[in-house]
From Swiss-Prot:
HAMAP family: RecR. SMART domains: TOPRIM (SM00493). It comes from the Bacteria. Keywords: DNA damage, DNA recombination, DNA repair, Metal-binding, Zinc, Zinc-finger. One of its GO terms (biological process) is DNA repair. The gene is recR. Residues 80-175 form the Toprim domain. May play a role in DNA repair. It seems to be involved in an RecBC-independent recombinational process of DNA repair. It may act with RecF and RecO. This is Recombination protein RecR. One of its GO terms (molecular function) is zinc ion binding. Belongs to the RecR family. PANTHER family: RECOMBINATION PROTEIN RECR. It comes from Geobacillus sp. (strain WCH70).
Length: 198
């Protein structure tokens, strides 16, 4: 189908976003045509503002508009504990729980030999430097419960063993409200391994 050039460019731009295929891109482009101009300009300004003003915290790697980020600046947080996550979205998920009060370290990925991503391609060296400079007593490995996340956690755990810092791994288990019969074997196994005394 042939579209006027501005619409074709907009469709192509939308298709660069993750999870947006041709049909959704076309639908979004035509929706933009129905929007008021000031709404479109505000949307475009928001995109530019995010790109210009959001960066990664030089301490932990989380997204921020100030450096260091609000978490690293907060003196009320437990500075003896660092939770290591793969992605800034993981920090946001952890913060929503309102149960963790320590600091974070964002790796920006996970070790994945199949994709050519090694330890040097993620922020492990920065983590090791932080651990030398700060009085950390515990590192919580909260990488994803998949092959890459587990490999990354094991790699970091082995690196930290000689330091004497306590290294823990978040337990992976059944979702609240989930039925045992619908859980896969790995989830059940991890739930059993991560059990705690009541």
């Amino acid at each position: 189908m042939h579209y006027p050039e501005p619409i074709s460019k907009l469709i192509d731009s939308f298709m660069k976003l993750p999870g947006i295929g041709p049909k959704t891109a076309i639908r979004l482009a035509f929706f933009v045509l129905t929007m008021k101009e000031d709404t479109v300009l505000e949307f475009a300004k928001s995109l530019v503002d995010v790109k210009r003003n959001i960066r990664y915290c030089t301490v932990c790697g989380h997204i921020t508009d100030t450096d260091p980020c609000y978490i690293c600046k907060d003196e009320r947080r437990d500075r003896t504990t660092i939770c290591v996550v793969q992605d800034p979205k993981d920090v946001i998920a952890m913060e929503k729980m309102k149960e963790y009060n320590g600091l974070y370290h964002v790796l920006h990925g996970a070790i994945s030999p199949m994709e050519g991503i090694g330890p040097e391609d993620i922020k492990i060296a920065e983590l090791l430097k932080r651990l030398q400079d700060e009085a950390v007593q515990e590192v919580i490995l909260a990488t994803n419960p998949n092959i890459e996340g587990e490999a990354t956690a094991m790699y970091i755990s082995r690196l930290l063993k000689p330091t004497g810092i306590k290294v823990t791994r978040i337990a992976h288990g059944l979702p609240v409200g989930g039925d045992l019969e619908y859980a896969d074997e790995v989830t059940l196994s991890k739930a059993l391994e991560g059990r705690r005394e009541l």
